[in-house]
Amino acid sequence: MPACVLAYSGGLDTSVILGWLQDEGWDVHCVYVDIGQPGEDKQAILKKAQDCGAKSARIVDVTEELCRDFAFPVLKAGAKYESIYLLGTSIARPLISKVMLQVAREVGATAYAHGATGKGNDQCRFQLAAEALDPTVQMIAPWRIKAFRDRFPGRTELIAYCEEKGIPVKATSAKPYSSDENCLHVSYEAGDLEDLSVAGVDVVDFTMGVSPQEAPDKLEEVTVGFEKGVPVSINGQKLDAKDLVEKANELAGRNGVGRIDMVENRFVGMKSRGVYEAPGMTLLYEAHRMLEELTLDRDLMHLRDQLSPIVAEMVYYGLWYTPKLDALFAFTDKAQEPVTGEVTLGMYKGNLSARRRSSPNSLYDAEIASMEGGGSYDQDDATGFLRITGLPSRVQGTVTPRSY
C-alpha cells in the first residue's frame, strides 16, 4: 500500500481524514507537530491515532525552533501583515510542512495530507512550502476533492462517519467560532465572527490573558534585552527563545496586551474577519521598535520600513522557502547588527509605553538634540543646508508658479 503522512491534530476533521485515507488505500503515518499548543493532552491524541489504525503516530516538538528560527526573524524585520497582524499562524505553517516532509522521508511516504480547506490561507502555506522543499511530493488536500466534499458536506456527516468507524470524537454542538493556537498567538475566525455587527472581543473566549478592563489598575514595568535585534532576556534573565516567548506571554497577558480585531485580505482573494491575541509578541515587537529608534540610522530605518510589508506579505502568503525572502532576511540580519540593548516598557490595561531605553550603539546625542543654548550643533549651518535642499523647488517655482 502507498504511504502518506498526515498532519494530525486529533480533532474531528483530521480524524475523519485519517479514516478516509485508509479507505482510499493509504498507509497513514500521523504526525502531531507540537508548536506550543496549550491545554491539549498530546499523549491521548497520539493514542487515538494509533487506535484508529495509523501505521505510525508521533509527536514532534519544534516549539523552540518556531520561536528562534521563524518568529524572531520576522520580528527583526518588523513585519506585520496589513500593518496589524503579527503572523502567528502564517509563521508556523512552513515549519509544519518541513517537519512533515522530514517524517515522510524517514518512513518512505510519497504523499503529504492536511486538513486545510480550499478557501483559506493555510492550504497555500502548507503546499508552497512542501513544493519548495520537495517538488516530488504528492499533496492530498481532501477538502479540495469534490468526492470528499460530496461524502462529507457538513459536520453531521463527519460525526456519523466517526460513529460508524468507532472513532472517538466530541460530538458537541459547534462553537460560535473556530480557533488555532500555538505559543505565539491564538487566532479566532468563522462562525459568529463572520457577522461584522458582532463585537469580536465580546464573542471570543480569550485564553492567553485578561481583558484590558480586568487587568490590574497599576502600571507594571518589564525590561526586554536584545542582541542584534533578537530578544534574549526579560527583566535581566537570559532565556531561550521558547521560554522568553512564554514569559512575555505571561507578563503581557496579565496586563491585557495584544488583542486585535481586523478584516484582512486573504491570499486567495477574499476578505475575512479575524480576531487575534498575541500578548508576548506584541510586547516584543514594541520593545524592538523602541530600541531601533536609538540604534538604526535614519535612511536604513526608512528602507527597512519599506521592506517590512513585503516580508509580511510573503510570510502571509506562504512564500517562506524562496530566494526573495532569503535575500530580505539577509538584509535584515545586516541591518539589525547594531540593535543591541535594553528597553523598559510600562504595561497598563492593554497599553504599552516607553519608560527607559539604552544601547551601547545608541545614535542619540543629547548635546546635539538639546533645545537649550550651546551644544555641538551650529544652527547657522542650517541656512546653507536649506538653500541647497530648496534649489530644485526655487527653480521649479520660477518656471511654473503654483497658485495659493
Model region roles, listed by residue range:
Residues M1-A7, L12-Y404:
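Nucleotide-activated chemistry modules centered on ATP-dependent adenylation/adenylyltransferase
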